[in-house]
Amino acid sequence: MSSAHNTLESIKYRRGVLQLLDQRRLPLETVYCDITSIDDICCAIKEMRVRGAPAIAVSAALALAVVAERELKEQRQNSVWKTADDMRQFLLMSCDKMMSARPTAVNLSKVLIQLKKDIETDKANTMEAVLETCVQLAEKIYAADVSFNERIMRHGAAHLLKLASKERVNILTICNTGALATSRYGTALGIVRQLFYEGHLQHLYACETRPWNQGARLTVYECVQENIPCTLICDSAVSAVMKTHDIDAVVVGADRICKNGDTANKIGTYNLAVAAAYHKVPFFVAAPSTTLDPLTPDGEGVVIEEREAAEITHIASGGGGLQSDKSNSDYGRKRVVADGPHLKVWNPVFDITPASLITGGIITENGVFPPATAGPLFDISRIVEP
């Protein structure tokens, strides 16, 4: 895969330096945030400056390496850290802190748990050696996600073309699953990219994805940057577009895929899957193996993050529709919903799509896994070991 196809960088990293594209400001502004502390990365994740399950995990790993290098210099100057174990303790505590930043996406916890295990079992006996281990582990995670993207793109594009039995296909998606959500090309949107690069994409239909409008702000932004043919639709138009347009497949990303195939993804994905089943449009989930969670039996065991009411009740005057009271004070906010003592707002960030509605299959870097014709539809433990 040639990097010439893709100029977007949500993550800018070189040893000792990490910058994350502030995705709250897109598409109106392109601003990168410097990550120099564990508090910085936790804030960036919680406030959705960085978002997308793979990007969150990669950013956390790289942040740990960058912060460790900065802390080592400072602590040595102050004579606080004296042994390799002092540094290990800092790294382990930092992993625990980052793990709580967003609960639903499994990639973050899986990456940090693995980092903790590797750091704890590492035999390095100097602080410098512990740092080198941390940096190498983080950079390996970064490189692996790029490779996962490339393989998901190829597997998904080839399978969709074979399934559709036509030269050019129409795809429907939700949220943003492209370069802005991963380390490079994307998962579901990466497949769309591959189809486009090969001349096999007729058109992409992108849901706006309320309330943060990741489809309108981010997916459309990526498509415009690369001249990918795209039509933006309201979330409530998915049934209409499937009825009136020749949609060949729905392809979405995932924040967690349970052992039985139940999938947590951006709110509205469940609606999309129901509509796809009714209109007999194949529904696919595209995600790296780091998103697979064989330890959670089904969707009932997934903690669904809920965010503040202001994301629905307020609009921002200059931030492309960003509504968070806490994270967008610099944009200015205006309430557009009547208020009253009996009004309640429910704002779940994710929903669970039952495995029975994933009619096309699950696409990972290891291939395409269609639902079984007998027995359980999916058994994620057969795709990836826990």
Curated annotation (Swiss-Prot):
Pfam families xref list: IF-2B
GO term, biological process aspect, one: L-methionine salvage from methylthioadenosine
Top-level EC class: isomerase
HAMAP family named among the record's database cross-references: Salvage_MtnA
Family of this protein: Belongs to the eIF-2B alpha/beta/delta subunits family. MtnA subfamily.
PANTHER family reported in the protein's UniProt record: METHYLTHIORIBOSE-1-PHOSPHATE ISOMERASE
Protein name: Methylthioribose-1-phosphate isomerase
